[in-house]
Every structure is written in C-alpha cells, then in structure tokens.
A protein has these predicted regions:
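Hydrophobic transmembrane-helix bundles of small-molecule transporters
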Residues: 159, 163-268
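Membrane-embedded alpha-helical core segments of multi-pass
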Residues: 65, 118-119, 144, 150-154, ...
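Short, charged juxtamembrane terminal tails flanking transmembrane helices
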Residues: 3, 461-464
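Short, Lys/Arg-rich, polar N-terminal cytosolic tail immediately upstream
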Residues: 1-9
Length: 464
C-alpha cells in the first residue's frame, strides 16, 4: 500500500524536506545567471542576445525535461530520477565552473537545466500522489514558496559571489548543492509507489523550441535571416504538436488544450510568466548597464520585488477561493501595466526608489494573475485530465519564460548595438533600450488585461 505524507506515512513524510530542497536547488540554478548577462557578454565579446541563451536555452531544455519527467518517473522511479537530476546539476555546474569559453559555459547551463525540468515535475508529482487530499493544497503551496524563495535568493547570492569572486566561482554554489543533495539522498530517499510501463517517442524529444527562440532573439538585429529561422521554429513547433496528438503514448498529452476555457487560462499564465521572467532579467540589465551598479547591488534591488511576488501568490490563491477569477485577474494585469508604466517613466529620470517600488507593484500584479489563472484553467477540466494539464502548465511556463526573455533581451541588445554605433555612451544606449523594451512589455500587459476581462466575464456569466 502506498504511503502518504500524513499519519502512517512516516517514510513518505520524511522525504518531503529533501524534495523541497530539490525544488530550491532547481529554482536557484534557473535564475542564477539573470544578473550575470552583462559581465558574460563583455568577457566573451558576444551580444546580449547571444549571452541570453544562458537563460533562454536553459528554459527550453527545462521545458523538454518537464515533458520527459512523467515517462522517467513511470519507468525508472523517483529515486533514479532524483539521481539523474542531481547528477545533471553537478555535471553542468562543473562544466560551467571551468568553462574556458562561452560555448562550454552554455553547454554547462543546458546540462544544468535537466535538473530543473526533472525536479519541478517530480516534486509536484510526489506531492500529488502521496498527500492526503485535505492537505494537498498546503503541501503544494509549501513547494511553490520554496521555488519562490530560490528565485528571490539566487540573484542576491549570485550577485555577491560574482562581484566578489568572479564568474567561475558562481558555479561552485549549485555544485555544492548538488553534492549535498546526492549525499543525503543516497541514504534518505526511498522509492514510493509502483513503477509503470510505456515508451518514449525520440522524435518528440528532439523537436523543440530552439529555432523559435533564436529567431525572436535576433530578429531585431538581423531581420531577414532571423525571420527565416523564426518561421522554421514555428513549423517545428507545429510538427511537435501534431505528433503529440497522433501518438498513442505522447510525450506531452495536448488534448486538454481542446477545452477553450483551459486554453485561454493557460494563455493568461504564459503572458504573466513572460512579463515576470523578463522583468527578472531586464531590471538587472538596467541596473548594471544603465546605472553602472554591481551585480550584487542589482540582485539585492531585485530581491524585494520578487519576494512581494511570492507573497502575492499566496494572497491571490486566497482571494480566488473567496471571489473567483472576477475581478482578481483583470485587476492583476491592470496593476502590472501600471507598475511597468511607472518603471518606464522613473527609469528615464532616473528615480531609483520609484523604479524599485513600481517593479514591486508589477510583481504583485503578476502574483494575482499566474496562480489564479492556472487554478481556474485546471478547474475547467475533468479530474482525469489534471495530470496531463499540469504537465502542459509546467512546460508552458518554461516556454513562455524563454520566449519572453529572448524577445525582450533581443530588442534591448539590438538597441544597445545601434545606440553605441551612433556614438551614444554605453549607459545611455542601455537606458534607451530599456525604455523601448518597457513599451513592448506595457503593450503586452494591456492586451492581456483585455483578454482577461473577456475571459473572466465569460466565466462569471456561465456561473449564472
């Protein structure tokens, strides 16, 4: 009989802290390079959009790993997946630690990303399978809080290490985390639940979003070749979706997307995550490139707004239970648009305190959007589709983050190159590029507000 996390399930309950530590390591590794892009670009003589592959490439691989995690858990079990994830984090961190050039550094980041994709999916699956239904929401919220803590702590700690000890030392942190997790997991982690059967489709693993993300990142700098790559990426993405629909045992079951309520809810989640992860990259670029701050100070200025986002996630869940999606999610997008608009105005002055405060407002708005939109989207489906829909949501979050950061950093990189070629000082070019990207982000937030108003109003009318 399968153990649960409640009374009588001591073995499963004892493993939860270890798995939460895995979630922390996964989120820490994911966001650790957000504050390092300017330094990496300068060190290796590459553009910002190229350096941003350390972030976008990571998210593409993580999205693929999320889709693959369900198969690996079913065939190999939790303990084996844990060791694969920790091994990927250790190997990728070791490669990046001693990387002599940008491409070895990128390879290390892509290997690291396997850890994030596997752990995000594995920990959620463990909680869903081994929690008493009355406590499942609490355990999932605890996991979400752990992930948010990693996202908030990573820029500060990484910035401190990067400023004080340099780029190589930055990867000693996730390497140490991986070694510690491997040691504890070897003695403490036990298999929970039976293994299943099934096969994975290799072509589905190969088909990915790389061409699409690359095209978005470079299209403003080199339009014609990038548009061709972008078109190829869209075609490959379409082929991936078609293959999942025709396979008997798909890598990622896309059938829940046939439900319009779920599909629109996921669209709102993706739009929110594009804004959230783009802010977490664009703000450090502004602080370091336009204002000349150190990586540590840039990370410290980002920590408060990210923590505000984590707290608003919890508040948003409670407000959703009480009021539903109306008017919560539209208000969240309105706050986001307002915060981004004030950031753009204050950054041009520059008024640092107002930039930080306004970015916190935008992050709070996003906290009222993402989790409620996800919960509402899932509620449109029958319980038999929850597992597939959760995998879609996790993969879409990584995809949206990759597309958003690639688009915005691509625009900023093109503006910086164009500005410096016209004789602008580097800081002035960063400032102008940041203002341009904020205009695009505000437009996306405003369009999202309109979509959320129509979606929330439709659901409200359906309830009568």
């Amino acid at each position: 009989m399968r153990a649960t996390l409640e009374a009588g399930g001591k073995e499963a309950r004892a493993q939860l802290p270890l798995l939460l530590a895995c979630s922390f390591a996964a989120s820490f590794a994911q966001s650790m390079m957000n504050i390092a892009l300017p330094q990496v670009a300068d060190e290796f003589g590459v553009t910002l959009s190229t350096a941003n592959w350390l972030v976008t490439g990571y998210m593409v691989v993580a999205a693929t790993s999320i889709a693959l995690a369900a198969f690996l858990l079913r065939r190999l079990g939790l303990r084996t997946v844990f060791f694969i994830g920790c091994g990927a984090l250790a190997l990728g961190s070791g490669l990046a630690l001693f990387a002599p050039n940008f491409w070895v550094l990128l390879a290390g980041r892509l290997v690291q990303a396997v850890c994030t994709g596997l752990f995000y999916s594995a920990v959620t699956s463990f909680i869903m399978a081994n929690s008493d239904p009355a406590r499942r929401g609490t355990h999932l919220a605890l996991n979400s809080g752990t992930v948010a803590a990693g996202l908030a702590v990573s820029p500060v700690v990484s910035g401190l290490v990067l400023t004080g000890f340099g780029r190589h030392a930055l990867f000693a942190l996730p390497l140490a985390l991986a070694v510690l997790l491997l040691a504890v997991g070897f003695f403490r982690l036990r298999e929970v639940g039976p293994r299943g059967t099934g096969a994975v489709d290799p072509l589905s693993v190969v088909l990915g979003l790389g061409a699409l993300v690359y095209g978005l990142g470079e299209v403003f700098r080199d339009p014609l070749p990038s548009l061709a790559v972008l078109a190829a990426g869209v075609a490959v993405l379409g082929l991936f979706a078609w293959r999942q629909l025709v396979l008997k045992d798909p890598l990622l079951n896309l059938r829940p997307l046939g439900n319009l309520g779920f599909a629109v809810g996921e669209l709102l989640v993706m739009l929110g995550m594009m804004a959230s992860f783009s802010l977490s990259i664009l703000l450090p670029l502004y602080y370091e490139g336009a204002l000349g701050f150190s990586a540590f100070l840039a990370g410290a200025l980002l920590a408060g707004p990210v923590l505000a986002n984590a707290l608003s996630d919890v508040v948003g869940g409670r407000l959703l239970d009480r009021w539903g999606i109306w008017p919560l999610v539209p208000c969240g997008f309105a706050l986001t648009a307002l915060g981004l608009a004030v950031v753009a105005l204050a950054a041009g002055r520059p008024l640092l305190a107002l930039v930080v405060l306004a970015s916190a407002v935008a992050y709070v708005g996003l906290g009222l959007v993402v989790a409620p939109s996800k919960t509402t989207a899932l509620s449109q489906l029958p319980p038999s589709l929850y597992a597939h829909a959760s995998s879609i949501n996790s993969a879409f979050i990584q995809i949206a983050s990759a597309i958003g950061s690639s688009l915005f950093v691509g625009v900023l990189s093109a503006d910086v190159l164009a500005g410096t070629s016209r004789g602008l000082a580097r800081a002035a070019a960063y400032d102008a590029g940041f203002a341009h990207t904020m205009e695009i982000a505000i437009g996306i937030a405003a369009a999202s507000l309109l979509v959320s108003l129509a979606y929330a109003y439709r659901l409200r009318r359906r309830r009568g």
